[in-house]
């Protein structure tokens, strides 16, 4: 009988926004099961390491600045060391962006990583939009099922789909305690909590005023429609707290929507991502534009409605690890802008998920 294969540490490169980094957690679970050790994750953005806090499929996380030359980045030396120390473990590159994929290839070359360890989602960098054929989670799982040239498939079989978990995020006990204390301070403790996420990466960015003035954000839904939706949600669940959530940069937008509702049951909060995850764990449902926080909510099993702009939910709809409902409103090919989606459509979708009882 052949001895069991030695456990290996997989390394995953993915230089993407929050939603993608949430969806990759199912692939991380596959790789952990397949190779016997949790993964090293290399991404971009200061928020990336905190996103994987408490995740048993992740051993370490490093994040580069997106536009700083990586040789000048503090993350470079520990990443180079981690790549060398994890040999002959596999390296999975989920990136295909025309700037980021060549950057990762340079990192691998300068770290001395054996090319036979590496498996790429795309051999060539991609510029501009791509016509997708499969959901991102499925594309990532297909990547994780591939075997690098330096290893043998028979020694590291791919776990069955039924054994996989995720996409999933985790909340720490200290974060639950902080959340519960905040809910008590606000007078929300013991009441149903419904989250609403009106913003996306454009509404929190430095050019947010310009996006709004020129009306060029395909994910923008007019203030009056958010107000009408919240009023109808309040009529359906009069005792619930309707909490408008965003980053601190989005608080003026949230307060504008709050004022337009004229409802005392509508609150606003600017949170960090970790605070958002804790709130999601306590929420009964959520309505979100197509954004990273929506993916986070689904990964924490929140019944969810996602309002789409130009993207297609066929390829980007958030997925839940528990089977909690996730419905889309709008998106290609039905519509190309969120403002083409009616309040009736979003409210009807929310009514469909709001009755789901979380375990």
What are the residue ranges of the model-derived segments?
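Catalytic machinery of carbohydrate-active enzymes
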Residues: 1-359
């Amino acid at each position: 009988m052949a001895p069991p294969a030695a456990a290996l540490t997989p390394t995953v490169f993915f230089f993407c926004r929050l939603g993608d980094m949430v969806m990759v957690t199912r692939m991380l679970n596959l790789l952990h099961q397949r190779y016997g050790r949790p993964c090293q994750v290399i991404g971009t953005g200061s928020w990336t390491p905190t996103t994987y806090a408490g995740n048993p499929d992740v051993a370490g996380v490093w994040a580069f600045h997106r536009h700083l030359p990586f040789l000048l980045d503090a993350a470079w030396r520990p990443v180079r060391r981690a790549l060398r120390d994890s040999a002959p473990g596999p390296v999975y590159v989920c990136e295909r962006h025309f700037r980021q994929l060549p950057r990762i290839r340079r990192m691998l070359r300068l770290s001395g990583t054996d090319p036979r360890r590496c498996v790429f989602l795309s051999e060539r960098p991609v510029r501009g939009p791509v016509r997708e054929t499969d959901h991102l989670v499925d594309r990532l799982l297909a990547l994780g099922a591939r075997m690098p040239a330096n290893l043998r498939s028979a020694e590291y079989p791919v776990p069955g789909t039924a054994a996989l978990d995720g996409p999933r995020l985790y909340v720490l006990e200290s974060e639950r305690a902080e959340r519960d204390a905040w809910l008590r301070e606000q007078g929300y403790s013991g009441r149903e909590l419904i989250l609403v996420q009106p913003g996306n990466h454009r509404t929190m960015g430095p050019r947010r005023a310009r996006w709004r003035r020129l009306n060029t954000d395909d994910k923008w839904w007019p203030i009056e429609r958010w107000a009408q939706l919240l009023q109808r949600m309040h009529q359906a669940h009069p005792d619930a707290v309707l909490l408008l959530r965003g980053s601190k940069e989005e608080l003026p937008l949230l307060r504008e929507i709050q004022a337009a509702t004229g409802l005392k049951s509508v609150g606003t909060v600017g949170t960090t991502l970790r605070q958002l995850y804790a709130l999601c764990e306590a929420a009964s449902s959520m309505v979100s534009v197509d954004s990273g926080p929506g993916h986070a909510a689904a990964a924490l099993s929140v019944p969810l409605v996602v309002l789409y702009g130009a993207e297609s939910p066929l390829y980007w709809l958030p997925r839940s690890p528990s089977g909690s409902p996730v419905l889309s409103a709008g998106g290609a090919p039905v519509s190309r802008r969120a403002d083409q989606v009616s309040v009736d459509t979003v409210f009807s979708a929310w009514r469909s998920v709001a009755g789901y009882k979380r375990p």
